[in-house]
């Protein structure tokens, strides 16, 4: 569980509602404070700072776990602690109010303070030292015991089993606990009920994680099968210490001894934590949008993670959160791994903390990485995690605001999550005093989260300033090309720029952005011309002009609209081809012209079908429709500004299939939301054709379901091609653009035609292009 402190570095703004279908909560203002942003993504001190945070992560000290480790008796004497240094730490680190724990002053973390304080009191009583500290600790417990049964308080994992057991242990030690006997009895009854429920319904894995709450010898025997190869229970010092106290297990001792050698005076709540913490920090950097500053270190971290994955590391595979995050990061970045490794999490009962919303969310996100048509493990994980998260969201039980907003966003946009939108939302909700809560609270010690947040905000805003200038230039280009004179046409320069800026936002990708937007704008106007403004004769005239590219003056223009459209295409392609030559070292104009020609002919064919009232077969429609969807001219030209693409790559089956799957997604998504409007205009699409050829057997609802199935098929195939590296010759940066197109299309066509709507996407676009983020120190 992630928690937000009440004392924070806050992001302030004037909030606007925006949607795509229900996206909410963007901010505007400007950054306060200065952090030097490198001129290039590969320069400056920022890289060194983040590298240090990524490679040398330390967790905060855990009073709770240190107290349990301090309770372990010496091997040769039950009257002496095995680790006296831990006992000394407990005696030296009581807070002024009598409690132990992180100095958070969080009003909803009192249960955590109660748990840590009682563990420390038990330790002191166990060794009959620090009686004054004991009395102060008991006073704190007595003053705050109300929180133990307050459902609004954040509850440490297993609190209802562990805390009553510690109370029972204290009573047996002779402690005069300032508690009402009836309250103690009620907590003990609740503990026993939860223990029985855990045994009967969920197995015993979650019992092993909260082993210090067990009281029966049979329970201890049951949980021993969850002991890890390093001797611990789920890398938990407290659980392992409790197990050793009860069973004197040699492997438990070895683990505890390794802790003592690694940590001087006190222990964290998780150990080892190298993989988990590095994965967590890398995930944070990606969400903040600044991971590009440490690309080489990121690659090394992922290589290390992959090696641990292939070795079957306990630190990964016995922790569902770590497993899910590692799976998502590795598969996203092209590592060949099987989803079968997540099979143990196909049912919620197998989680050792089944109520951990953060864990369930990570499993849900991992389930979205299905790249094969038959990945039943991911399908089953998706089924239960999506249901569980929707239920918790509906009931309003996710108390942490940042986590609640992330769950809401991810559920509503499973396939439409765009990088820059997620960066902004994460920056907005990011809290520099966040702590995580498992059996006790903890945080990363050497991660300067204030610095990261300030840097991420300024990085976002600097890129945004660049976007604003580019968009101004593009809007002037629309006027200069006279495209704005065609009043029947949709003017979508801002939406087009928003789409590409959500992924290719870095300064280096200027030409790719310009190419994407110019082709998108022209294509939208041409599409409207074919549907609204032009006769078949005019359409044929435009195609002939493109066919006679260098000799177009011999053709002539059937209308002023044709002249405007042709010269927009002609001048833009010539200009882009000249720029691309400098990147590619060869002329790519013929490919760009042919791409446009193929698109224009496919749209003309559809116009002829409408005019002649032709009913095609489904195969005829699809084989033409994925081309008329129009992604070809937009994507192909942009890719020439990302990487050097040989003719072998451009003509490869891989390249063609990436385009085909992307275009199929485009066509089918559009058809699904426009079935009724297309029918009213006499146009056929993949929904109506199924009904027509179904001879009364297939309903429109069934046809929509089949189209949805087809979309998912092509989405998985596309994602597989994007992430797989073996046998691939298309550069990863280029494959990512195909995937971007898929996600932006899912966003635009989530529930209706958001691209054509003049207002539906405007606030989302403004959030990326026009509204900077403001950070204020409070």
From Swiss-Prot:
Listed result of changing residue 674 to T: Slightly decreased catalytic activity
Intracellular or extracellular location(s): Plastid, Chloroplast
Free-text remark on how the cofactor is bound: Binds 3 Mg(2+) ions per subunit.
Domain notes: The Asp-Asp-Xaa-Xaa-Asp/Glu (DDXXD/E) motif is important for the catalytic activity, presumably through binding to Mg(2+).
Transit peptide: first to last position: 1-35
Required cofactor(s): Mg(2+)
Source organism (scientific name): Ricinus communis (Castor bean)
Pathway: Secondary metabolite biosynthesis; terpenoid biosynthesis
Binding site for Mg(2+) 2: 527, 531
EC number: 4.2.3.29, 4.2.3.-
Family per record: Belongs to the terpene synthase family.
Protein task: Diterpene cyclase involved in the biosynthesis of labdane-related diterpenoids (LRDs) natural products. Catalyzes the cyclization of ent-CDP into ent-sandaracopimaradiene as a major, and ent-pimaradiene and ent-labdatriene as minor products.
MF GO annotations: ent-kaurene synthase activity; ent-sandaracopimaradiene synthase activity; magnesium ion binding; terpene synthase activity
Class of enzymatic activity (EC top level): lyase
Gene3D superfamilies associated with the record: 1.50.10.160, Farnesyl Diphosphate Synthase, Terpene synthase, N-terminal domain
GO cellular component, one term: chloroplast
Name listed for the protein in its UniProt record: Ent-sandaracopimaradiene synthase KSL3, chloroplastic
GO biological process: gibberellin biosynthetic process
Catalytic activity entry: ent-copalyl diphosphate = ent-sandaracopimara-8(14),15-diene + diphosphate; ent-copalyl diphosphate = ent-(12E)-labda-8(17),12,14-triene + diphosphate
Binding residues annotated for Mg(2+) 3, in chain numbering: 670-671, 678
Motif (DDXXD motif): 527-531
